[in-house]
């Protein structure tokens, strides 16, 4: 839209497309609540004031509160297991109108092809979808990825999508930064000279190492787990994204770090949320509501979900309800219960009475719904011979991506190490599903599985095929079924498939509606409970391969000592 089109509307000389009257507007700049009217032309707010009283369409808000559209500072769409359009349909009723998505899940499987898919699939939908170019493809060379995204690829992508790509995705390989890895530093230099943000990922980093990491122009972090960690990073100039995902939930521990003086440098993000979690709890709106419930001032909480994030990413016309800004507006009943009733996007109501009121589809009709193929080694054995030594195992921590290393005496039967159900220890195997180069075997504690097996092609970040279970027969059947459905999640009990969710888009996302996926996921989780465990274990399983978050992880190449970035043996000399 041209400037000369909107100025006559602001002056009252021409009629706006939409007039929202009798609204209580939260001004994120002043912190005041203003009883006023809002005049909108096309995708922009033309004017604010009680002097505006005509419009081609007039909506009486009847004293509802108007806040800016909510912004998710860091999200992986793929973690929802939904196609991008279905993901948009889920989060719009929750008031999210803008996301900064890092497509490094699909990029680690399909490379540039995967990034192209995500960008095209979100073109022309009533959701502002910006992308961070994945910095970690692969995240580490201690696993086998489906692709390598080099500096030359980044240059090509920036030339092709200069306005959709606004950052370098989370720099997970912080050892690479500290060791001045040539390829990684080159990527950072390319993006910073294009005036793009460099997003961080540095769990537990502090002191001199944190200083060195920030020296590489890394300006944000979403991995803080404690108040002291957040305040140290904030004090050194980092913008803190408070994460509240499905598996990793840091809101309660980090809200105490926020105060009236420093809150401008905090934002909210979901990072990874599955669709059932979004359906039950919500999206950024849930984080805002919970933060307010913990005593945070509503104005501060809403700033953290809107203008703070927009300012950080240089989204100059977003994050506020002001003249010339994008008409991304959310109407809520009050600032405490935070019930979202209407969402306006580009002068149109996309949500009415809390429900989608607009057909959402991409302008691209040729986006594939099935891409990628699962490919693993054909000849394998899951048996582990006893060597009369102790073994190192992965220990899961609830609601955390951080795992611990434990040294235990294994359970042995017929000279083979087997799952030790009584002590909550089960076998896990990870297969390279991209090149069929091999697999590794380990053991994990804390899943609660007492019978059966679970297999999945979701495994951050290279998303290799992982299977864990109490016995080899069920594990082998789970692998077989995963191959038949070309990726997804399979649950086995007593040598029978009791539930499955097919994910044909790169083995990560479904091509079905979000309602269908939620129903299947609910059935899947109930089936997992039949194995004796709690259903929230699934998201933990999906992060057991993440070899850039401490302490002990497993990839197709073996057990990984994350802090020292090296492969370690299953057996331990004592």
UniProtKB/Swiss-Prot annotation:
Cofactor(s) this protein cannot do without: Mn(2+)
Single GO biological process annotation from the record: adenine catabolic process
EC assignment: 3.5.4.2
GO molecular function annotations of the record: adenine deaminase activity
Family, similarity comment: Belongs to the metallo-dependent hydrolases superfamily. Adenine deaminase family.
Name of the gene encoding the protein in the UniProt record: ade
Reaction equations catalysed: adenine + H2O + H(+) = hypoxanthine + NH4(+)
InterPro entries: Adenine_deam, Adenine_deam_C, Amidohydro-rel, Metal-dep_hydrolase_composite, Metal_Hydrolase
SUPFAM superfamilies: Composite domain of metallo-dependent hydrolases (SSF51338), Metallo-dependent hydrolases (SSF51556)
The protein's name: Adenine deaminase
Highest taxon in the source lineage: Bacteria
